[in-house]
Amino acid sequence: MTAIIQVENLQKFFKVFKHHRGLGGAFRNLFSREYQLVHAVDGISFDLQPGELVGYLGPNGAGKSTTIKMLAGLLVPTGGRLSVNGQIPWQDRTKYVSKIGAVFGQRTTLWWDLPVVEGFDLLAAIYRLDPADYRRTLDRMVGLMRLERLLDQPVRQLSLGQRMRCEIAAALLHRPRILFLDEPTIGLDATTKLAVRDIVRTLNREEGVTVLLTTH
């Protein structure tokens, strides 16, 4: 079976300003800009098969989020090779994002002042989903994520756990085959973390979605 995600010797380096301390350092910073390379991701290789659910573990600063952003096409690697579902993520972005879903724990794709369901409707319009297909998928996600009582609430009024369930549903409205989850349980209490993980396992088992999830 051909891997749906192929990563070989992936690298991402960032050029960061080197700050010198003290009064002398302040003058040096003012007149001489020095930089250093930070190796955020350095030589990672792995494959994922269709339908796998894989946890990507590591401490803060290990490069987990940077890796997910490269897989999602938000960052271009410094070196190495990367293919997702036969595509290069940062090329032909419009076509690529229609095939994947992504959730970043500290960011939202929904609109803070709009009710949840209106945010879903806007995303359906952006993805140009067939109305009947969208309604079936929405009904499925609402039942799976237990969103019935949340649909008419503005996003800003939701708890963190409620918002995360809505974010995962939003990422799946266009029925992607691949889902990237970057710290989806960050800041959640233990009970809510377990609930989110159960939802992800159910999605993987019943919908066949390939999932890559980062966590500590």
Predicted feature descriptions by range:
Residues G80-Q91, K95-Y96:
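Conserved ABC transporter NBD signature motif
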Residues L194-E207:
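Helical segment within the ABC ATPase nucleotide-binding domain
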Residues R175:
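Conserved catalytic motifs of ABC-family nucleotide-binding domains
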Residues L179-D182:
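Catalytic Walker B motif of ABC-type/P-loop ATPase nucleotide-binding domains
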